[in-house]
């Protein structure tokens, strides 16, 4: 990342006085970072979703393709811009230090229940698909769309920007 501008910094202050903390955080704020204060416990709970779930799903895509024997190169002629972005995320993660991700994923005590919920969600969606009827899938989709209603507009705009950048490069 070339700059802190727009990056998120989670501050979990412990054993630091308020003046020293304010001075430290002001360095990040001057560089354009967004600061969120959190307890260590809340940080780990949220990171179980923000990092743990996200990276686990990315690794699951890679593992699934490897098990199927479908290389990223073989999918090239079939890829859509969204798929290309997904493959970029997979490739980016796999090009990094595995120890960083091993520590991040294995040392967060809140991640196992998140992954259990993910497995249950995947099983629910799989059952809906395997039913051969569109109704169960539509029901899941509608519930999830309602839950995410607060971000769907901005998410569409942001991903439209990414897709446009992908197809114009």
Which residues does each PLM region occupy?
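Interdomain hinge/lid region at the active-site interface
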Residues: 74-151
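Conserved Rossmann-fold dehydrogenase catalytic segment
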Residues: 31-53
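Amphipathic alpha-helical blocks and their helix-capping loop/short-beta junctions
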Residues: 48-89
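Composition-driven low-complexity repeats that form or flank extended alpha-helical/coiled-coil segments
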Residues: 142, 146-169
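Rossmann-fold dinucleotide-binding core
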Residues: 1-34
């Amino acid at each position: 990342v070339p700059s802190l501008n727009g990056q998120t910094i989670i501050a979990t202050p412990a054993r630091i006085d308020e003046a020293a903390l304010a001075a430290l955080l002001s360095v990040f704020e001057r560089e354009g970072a967004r600061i969120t204060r959190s307890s260590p416990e809340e940080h780990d709970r949220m990171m179980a979703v923000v990092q743990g779930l996200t990276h686990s799903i990315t690794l699951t895509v890679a593992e699934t393709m490897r098990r199927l024997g479908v290389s990223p190169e073989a999918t090239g002629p079939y890829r859509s811009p969204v798929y290309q972005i997904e493959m970029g995320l997979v490739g980016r993660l796999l090009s990094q230090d595995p120890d960083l991700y091993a520590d991040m994923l294995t040392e967060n005590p809140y991640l196992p229940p998140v992954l259990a919920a993910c497995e249950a969600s995947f099983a629910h969606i799989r059952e809906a698909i395997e039913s051969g009827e569109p109704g169960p899938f539509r029901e899941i989709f509608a519930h999830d769309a309602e839950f995410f209603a607060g971000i769907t507009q901005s998410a569409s705009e942001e991903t439209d920007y990414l897709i446009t950048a992908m197809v114009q490069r």
